[in-house]
């Protein structure tokens, strides 16, 4: 029996985590976000109604679930208020279902200004951030000058700390980036206007999770972005600013690391990436266009067209190692319907001619890397909405089996459409 289940992306994000978290929370009492910020974009489709969440955990739509934003998440008060209002306008009582860690760093207007000023200054070498202030907020946290949710309990001290940190950042904005200064009074007024709402949701998350563990409650930890965007283990510097791997669960929520029972890796049946950075299996031909169109590969947060390519099992094996994956959930299998053949990257050819089956680390080391493919027959039959494994074409079953063989991890869940009902649960993580 797995009480603490982690759901995370095994690629570069956009694997379809939100739907799976929402589906599995039928049995959960708590859903916890432990890293990232409102740069995430989790799309849920329930009874045909689409909901996109960026900051609030995907369990918020269920009345039996308490959603928690852990200390590893950088929290934008304005983004949270906007998201809360959208949900409350639809009759969802967010304030009754959402709790926050007081250790969450705040994202304020000057973080956004810095993020955008830096990307502009980088020009052609831009990282491709979402421009939401995520990186600068994490920088402030590590530099120990960041303001946190808990600082809002003492409004007078908060105002003093804010003045100090804004003088520092405005100096950089004006003198180095030649950008406009951010108005201190506006930031203070905007934050004070929502301070009481934020502090009313504060709880000791680590203690709450430990009590839940002792009671035997089911807890779901919801990852954002994907393994290959991890600040330490991803394609640095083309990465996000947090630990997207399973190790981030303990540090970003306060759960003891030995208490993680099952790690579910969400695996898209092909590969996508947003923004700059290495992508060995990227396709620039009509197949790449087909995957983009069929998969509706446009970012939920930015609306940017995603880069598309074949599934890279070399990179996925790295995700298996980093996360000690228990099982996969394979998503978007239906996007491959109609292709005459499908390919799996099984190794890389390095610039010096060597064949390797492990990924390079730094982005520069990926230069000149060529994918080595295994080609399999495709299938013409539709897999969309199929709810039983026996209803899948043999060629699709062969593709699934080969992924399991190449990665050494079982596919426990298969998703065949965006709705939560269009799913085959072969092994429930909470029963594993």
From Swiss-Prot:
Q: What does this protein do?
A: Plays an important role in the de novo pathway of purine nucleotide biosynthesis. Catalyzes the first committed step in the biosynthesis of AMP from IMP.
Q: Which InterPro entries match?
A: Adenylosuccin_syn_GTP-bd, Adenylosuccin_syn_Lys_AS, Adenylosuccinate_synth_dom1, Adenylosuccinate_synth_dom2, Adenylosuccinate_synth_dom3, Adenylosuccinate_synthetase, P-loop_NTPase
* Subunit structure, as described in the record: Homodimer.
Residues recorded as binding Mg(2+), renumbered to this chain, are: 14, 41
What PROSITE patterns has UniProt attached to this entry?
ADENYLOSUCCIN_SYN_1, ADENYLOSUCCIN_SYN_2
* Annotated catalytic residues: 14 (proton acceptor), 42 (proton donor)
Q: What is its main location?
A: cytoplasm
Q: Which HAMAP family match?
A: Adenylosucc_synth
Q: Give the enzyme's EC designation.
A: 6.3.4.4
Q: Which residues are listed for GTP binding in this entry?
A: 13-19, 41-43, 306, 332-334, 415-417
Q: Which cofactor does it need?
A: Mg(2+)
GO-annotated biological processes: 'de novo' AMP biosynthetic process; IMP metabolic process
Q: What keywords appear on the UniProt entry?
A: Cytoplasm, GTP-binding, Ligase, Magnesium, Metal-binding, Nucleotide-binding, Purine biosynthesis
- GO CC: one term? cytoplasm
What CDD domains does the record point to?
Answer: AdSS
- Write down the chemical reaction(s) this protein catalyses: IMP + L-aspartate + GTP = N(6)-(1,2-dicarboxyethyl)-AMP + GDP + phosphate + 2 H(+)
Q: Which superkingdom heads the taxonomic lineage of this protein's source? A: Bacteria
Give one GO molecular function term. Answer: GTP binding
Localization per Swiss-Prot or TrEMBL: Cytoplasm
Which pathway is this protein assigned to?
Answer: Purine metabolism; AMP biosynthesis via de novo pathway; AMP from IMP: step 1/2
Q: Which family does it belong to?
A: Belongs to the adenylosuccinate synthetase family.
Q: What is this protein called?
A: Adenylosuccinate synthetase
Q: Where does IMP bind?
A: 14-17, 39-42, 130, 144, 225, 240, 304
